[in-house]
């Protein structure tokens, strides 16, 4: 659809909605029109324009990403131990968890840092299954096949991470704890590498 056609349709709709004469300046360029249209559609939850990379999600999701981006590269000491002084801090965000696989500790820590703690009492979880079961009960789970937003948790069978961004072609970029014994950035196809679902915390 051309810019002129789109503007004509917008003008017609405005006339129907507001029968009194209204003087409005139309955007001078296609870029201004696109920005105005995006701004108007954002509150309705409409998807970004085609070709756009989803780089920001909810405020809670953005806060989670702000917490975890500096953690990329944090590694187990020694490798294969599921532990380090920093991983011990992630573990403290869960109730009574011991040394063990720590991807769920990491997302529990990140959510707590972002002010949206996981669990009915904010206790966090040491097991992926517990995170997803809580999210389903709390109405925060999204099914496999959904399009995630940055900051959403991405859940697999026995592993969990955080969506960093989603490319226009559906490619999903993540940050994950306990991935190759460290906090790592990974990339998956639009199916999230077989993700079983997502969790949107805010």
Describe each PLM feature range.
Residues 33-118:
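N-terminal capping segments
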Residues 82, 86-98, 155-193:
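Glycine-rich catalytic cores of cysteine/serine-nucleophile enzymes that process amide/ester linkages
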Residues 9, 191-202:
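Low-complexity, Gly/Ser/Thr/Pro-rich intrinsically disordered linker/tail segments
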Residues 10, 71-72, 112-115, 165, ...:
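Generic helix-packing signal
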Residues 5-8, 12-15, 35, 39, ...:
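Charged/polar, solvent-exposed surface patches and flexible loops
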Residues 116-181:
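...with weaker cross-activation on analogous glycine-rich loops/strands in unrelated enzymes
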Residues 13, 67-72, 79-80, 85, ...:
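Hydrophobic/basic alpha-helical segments enriched in Actinobacteria
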Residues 1-35, 57-61, 202:
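Short, compositionally biased, intrinsically disordered N-terminal export/targeting signals
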